[in-house]
Amino acid sequence: GLLETGAEVVAIEIDEVLANQLPDTVAERMPGAVERLEVVLSDALDVKVIPGAEPTALVANLPYNVAVPVLLHMLAICPQWSTGVVMVQSEVADRLVAAPGSKIYGVPSAKLAWYAEAIRVGNVPPTVFWPVPNVDSGLVRITRRRPPHVDGRDPRVTRSQVFRVVDAAFASRRKMLRSALAGLCGGSMAASELITAAGIDPTARGEALDIGDLARVVEALAQAGALSDSGQV
């Protein structure tokens, strides 16, 4: 387990019974490790600050119904953690690691790519759980990286701006980018001009663009004043 490595562990658990039991279980099986464990009783999406020393890694069995929002939230509030392994439903694992051009590449793939590289590193059969679920699970390894470069430099855009454009680009997979972003740009003609200025084909679809391409589009829109931002990073 994590405590056996000598690491300090912060465990986030929404179930009060499990959260209360965990310290007792550790005290019974690894008495010397109790002081290195802190349990936070909370919905992970409500956590704003991780107590104690800044965490450097994430290891999680994510709730399958909210796996993507929880993962993105943890990446946002813990900019210092550099690596992680998460278990999610098999189909979600495929979407998280999907590459541009694939049928399952979408919002989760692009948003995760803003933060990190992700690869699928294993399968977990339902038979290892009790009770046995009717879904397969997958393990995804995440390695944080800097946001993608735009023309060899860091993009002059914020995460919130990028995510707004990602949401718009994938809202309708059949739409060309100029149509998908028309609402942000004041029309498809303006969108086409700005997308072209970014060096991207305005007739392309969002599913064909990697996060670097999308960041270039966002920068062009932001420079033209097409995106207002609250200052989030």
Where are these regions (language model features)?
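Catalytic cores of RNA-modifying enzymes
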Residues: 1-165, 196, 207, 216-219, ...
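C-terminal lobe and adjacent flexible extensions of AdoMet/dcAdoMet transferase-like proteins
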Residues: 167-233
